[in-house]
Regions:
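Long, charge-rich boundary regions
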Residues: 473, 487-524
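Conserved catalytic cores of very large enzyme subunits
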Residues: 1-316, 337, 343-494
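Flexible, active-site-adjacent loop/turn segments at secondary-structure boundaries
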Residues: 100, 104, 262, 320, ...
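Extended amphipathic alpha-helical segments enriched in small hydrophobics
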Residues: 318, 322-331
Length: 524
């Protein structure tokens, strides 16, 4: 019923944006498939980062005479407050709500109360289960994300820790020992999965790697990575990564638009013609950001987002986020190329496209970033529209995400990394490199070695280890892709990451299912 209500209200809201807010050029570009305006079924901004430090300092605020609370005195209380806060904010935003410095800001509570790993695990288990309850609109779990510093950051080392809204007589730097307790407890909960052996969708966990990372003494972390593909690995010194991997506090994305560059390439008579068309359609996208920002500011002032209003005064510091879909197919359909992204000429052209867009965005008066948009639905949406209008367009019924290689290109992860690292660093918003593994990995030390190798030898800002796993209703978790349970011979559920988080393969759209069937996983 919640999904039906969301669907019906979404159609009304989409019609409002397209008929009452956007002008004919923007509306037609969206309807015709030249571009796609994300979250058009919602009257909100996209994703946002919030200050966990502020929540610890002030507690939950009183808004419109609703229930408020004092700052948490204990970790168990704080975990409940975080669940409530993220659920509340999700109702005023369309996508990810994130906390940075999750571990750094929680460890003083462990230090103060001298909590054991078991006690911390119980608190975090409550948080994890609470955040996965379908409490947001449409009977969905809040789309939440947390970032782990792993080591206390330099800016926190000499800073007085905060517990119960007050400064303590110790600093965050005094809590490095408790960081290990929190990490072990968190990933112990992740490793258990739910009662049926399924992994937790949320929160999406991102972790900053560093040159001093203790690779061979983080068993719980790499077990979670091998079993459920958690976390995302961020290379902090290489790029200050934002996006759905966690915006900084009081920053985020107010809207996302993805460009159909496959159509642009197919219709263009030459490379020069392509860039003229790209310039024109990106102008339309940028104008849509200006319109949406104005509308959101008006609605914020009118009181439509009361909890958001308690923290920000406008959306002027929030990014418009531009993305592209189908670079591989664009190269295949370009008259001057006719080659996929494994080809050097296609790679050179793709870099020219990314550099063109980055140069254009840097010269904007408004804040706009370039993102490898997840676009799990848009990949199929664009391909279906184009197939009807232009039957000769080459595709497999979907377009490849952003500048990714075709999923059947190679089973050599290091070849793929070598090609992708230049592309990945062009995205100022968010991107990731997924290491797809179909068979699963039983040895956590092998995962640790793989992560270490990628971190030390390839310049990718974000990457994931993405094993496929299976679940039998009766026998629970099964390693790797197993369509039939070896114990009872019943059909299983297959799980893999679809553009950001894990979902049951049966719930993927038609295009993404086709992509999964063609996917050549990496040999590890």
């Amino acid at each position: 019923m919640g999904g039906l209500i969301l669907s019906n209200s979404g159609m009304i809201t989409s019609n409002y944006w397209l008929s009452e807010v956007y002008d004919a050029q923007i509306t037609n570009a969206h309807k015709n498939g030249d571009l796609y305006i994300h979250n058009i079924n919602m009257l909100t901004g996209c994703s946002a980062g919030w200050s966990l430090e502020n929540l610890i300092l002030k507690g939950l605020p009183s808004v419109n005479k609703m229930i408020s609370s004092l700052p948490a005195k204990h970790l168990s209380t704080l975990c409940n407050q975080m669940v409530n806060f993220l659920g509340i904010m999700q109702n005023e935003w369309a996508s990810a709500q994130s906390f940075a410095h999750f571990d750094t800001l929680l460890v003083p509570f462990i230090h103060q109360d001298k909590l054991s790993v078991k006690m911390v695990s119980d608190c975090l288990e409550s948080f994890i289960y609470g955040i996965n309850i379908p409490s947001r609109w449409g009977t969905q779990a809040p789309f939440s994300q947390i970032t782990l510093d792993w080591n206390v950051p330099q800016e926190f080392i000499n800073k007085k820790a905060i517990v119960a809204g007050c400064e303590c007589d110790f600093t965050y730097g005094d809590c490095q020992k408790e960081m290990k307790i929190l990490h072990d407890a968190l990933f112990e909960v992740i490793n258990k999965g739910d009662v049926s052996g399924r992994g937790f969708q949320f929160p999406i966990i991102a972790l900053y790697l560093n040159p001093d990372f203790d690779w061979m003494h983080e068993e719980e972390l790499f077990k979670a990575c091998a079993k459920y593909g958690t976390p995302y690995f961020l290379t902090k010194e290489k790029q200050d990564v934002e996006g759905y991997f966690g915006y900084k506090p009081l920053c985020g994305s107010m809207g996302v638009v993805t460009l159909n560059i496959v159509r642009l390439a197919y219709l263009s008579s030459s490379k020069e013609d392509f860039f003229k068309r790209l310039d024109n359609v990106s102008d339309v996208a940028l104008r849509s950001f200006e319109v949406k920002r104005q509308v959101l500011n008006q609605l914020l002032e009118a009181g439509l987002y009361p909890y958001t209003k308690a923290y920000i005064s406008d959306f002027n510091d929030y990014y418009g986020t531009l993305g592209i879909v189908g670079m591989n197919e664009a190269c295949l359909n370009a008259k001057w190329l006719k080659k996929g992204l494994m080809d050097l000429d296609a790679q050179t052209f793709s870099m020219e496209v990314l550099e063109f867009l980055n140069h254009k965005l840097l010269n904007q008066s408004q804040k706009v970033n370039l993102k490898a948009t997840p676009a799990e639905s848009v990949c199929t949406h664009f391909a279906q529209i184009d197939q009807e209008l232009y039957p000769e367009i080459q595709s497999h019924g979907y377009y490849t995400n952003s500048t990714y290689l075709d999923v059947a290109s190679t089973d050599d992860v290091f070849e793929a990394l070598h090609i992708q690292q230049d592309f990945q660093n062009q995205y100022s918003g968010a991107t990731s490199f997924p290491v797809f593994i179909d068979h699963g990995i039983a040895d956590w030390k092998m995962v640790a070695l793989l992560v270490k190798t990628i971190y030390e030898n390839y310049d990718v800002p974000v990457f994931t280890i993405t094993p496929t796993y299976s679940v039998c209703e009766e026998h629970g978790y099964l390693l790797g892709h197993q369509d039939i349970c070896p114990k009872c011979s019943k059909s299983t559920e297959i799980y893999s990451r679809v553009s950001g988080y894990y979902r049951n393969l049966e719930d993927w759209n038609e295009g993404k299912q086709k992509e999964f069937s063609r996917r050549k996983t990496y040999s590890i």
